[in-house]
Each structure stands twice: as C-alpha cells, then as structure tokens.
C-alpha cells in the first residue's frame, strides 16, 4: 500500500477544495506546490497591514448558493462590490457600460436616449455579421464606446489589434440601461476578510503540504507516493509539450507602497487608451475598505507568454482549442490521474466555477 491515497499537485483553489473533501472522507493526502506559498493565483499577502492580491484582483462572486455556503465555512466575506472605473485620457467612466457611462459619454439621461444613441451608431456602422472583435463591439455598443473604452484596453490585454481578435471575446462585457455600477450580476459577492490565503489555509487544515516542490522535475518518485494523482498544473507541460505548447497570455505586476492613504479612490481603475502601457491599476486596500495610513498599488501589464512565464489566460482560439482537444484525449487515457483547474483543463475559470467542478469531481472520486 502506498503512503498516500492522493497526491494533489497544486495548492490553488481546485487542489485545496479537493484535498479538503478527500481528507473529510478519510483519505490520506499530500498537497505539493512548486511555488513557496499556498492558494495559487488567489494568494494574498499582508503589506503595510493591507492584503495584497499578488496575482491580480480576485473578487468572489457567484449565483450558486451551495458554493457560497461552502466558502463561508472557511471565511467571513465582506460586502465588497466590484465597480471598476475606466480612465480614458483623464476622462472617468463607470463600468460595466451603464447609464452612468452613457450620461458621461453623451449627456443622455434616459434609457430611451441612450438606446437611441447606440442604435444610431450601430446603424451608421452597418455591421450585420461581425467578423472580428472590433466589428462585434461596434455592433453591440456603437463606435464611441468602442473607441474610448474597448479598443485600446482590449488590444493591450491580448497584445494584438481588435481586428485580429475573435468576435466572441467581447461577450464578457455586460451592457445595462440602469444606473447600476455593480459589475457582476451575481446574488453573492465579496472578499474574504483577512484575504484569500487565510481561507485556503483553513481548507487545507490538517492536510500535509510541501512547498517548493516541482512535480514534473521529480514525477516518478512523487507518483510512487500515492495511489492517485490530482494534477492542476498545465496539461501540455505534463506531457512534455509533446504536441506543442498551448498559448496563454501572461500578466506582469509592478507593485509599490505609496506614502498616501488613498491613491485613486477605487480598487480597480482600467486605463483604456492604447498609449498607457499598463491595462489597470489595483489599489488593494479598497477591497477591504482599509483605512491604513499608506496604500499599496499594482500596475498590471499584459504580456506575451513564453515557456517559464506565469500562464494566466488561455488563448481560446480555434488552433489552441484543437490542440487542447488532443491533449485532453491523452489526459483521459492517463491512468490514476485527474486533470483539473484552469491549467489542467486549459480553461478560463471564475473562482466559483473552480469550486463547483472540484466538488463534483471529488464527489465522483470519493464515492
């Protein structure tokens, strides 16, 4: 009999939820992570008494009551509501696109006026079958909003002009004809008081954890420790990039402590012009309504990904989709290994969905 029932590769949200459920079911688990900390990309660290989101803003939101109840076992959530603003050459616009945005953009006051303005711009453009993101955006919100709030920002995010991006990406941007700045249309929303790391620590309570362990560098020896493996690393790396590397976008952060108590008045400010090199600035204290004398900001830069960089967003185009489908066949044929999470499934996952999937996989595994 092997020393552990499960070797869980990755101490992020998927790995932590699975480990928690497995331990609860009486299984012997070892969690390893190649980083020097748990919690994966939702890791928060205290700086000047402020919980800093090291890998970018993470705002928990869900419509799934069971998932909400699940996370509330491990943390108390505050009432933070995501209401980012856009800065376009010093003009400030509310996001998501709503009546506040339209009022600032055109001076319109009623939903009927805003709708008329957008319809007029859509008609002028005359796009019936959008072939790329630029056409899709203009066909949804007209030219003004596209030019000021989408074009530069999205181009920076993806490192290519909107004319070269697939139309479907823009579906992630909601449009509303109400004066409502709440970005997520979710029943439940907030940030765990004390940060995400403390929440994941609670999930992993009583589970053996080894950090700074590179699974793929010592795979055979680590595999020998456990009956089954739950792998949440990159699926292509697992197979030695045999079919080629899946593409990602990466993100780089410049974080600094400032000797002021309030730098920008909002947790998230998107810079939507093409000239500003960063995509947004995060002021971390506002996630937890902080009143500390100093503040910590992170400038976020979107970057091309190459092997060795931190993979953030899968590039969900046809080419990468087809390549992942081939890797998935290999993954499905791999005995005693469960592939899961953002990297293991090459998928953009919101946090609540990661938990949902991890719980459902754990239920099947542990039956």
Regions found by a protein language model. Give the residues of each.
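Short, solvent-exposed loop/turn segments at secondary-structure junctions
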Residues: 13-14, 36-37, 100, 155, ...
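Mid-domain catalytic core of redox enzymes
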Residues: 215-330
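N-terminal Rossmann-like FAD-binding beta1-loop-alpha1 element of flavoenzymes
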Residues: 4-31, 362, 366
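Dinucleotide-binding Rossmann-like beta1-alpha1 core, especially the glycine-rich loop
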Residues: 48-123
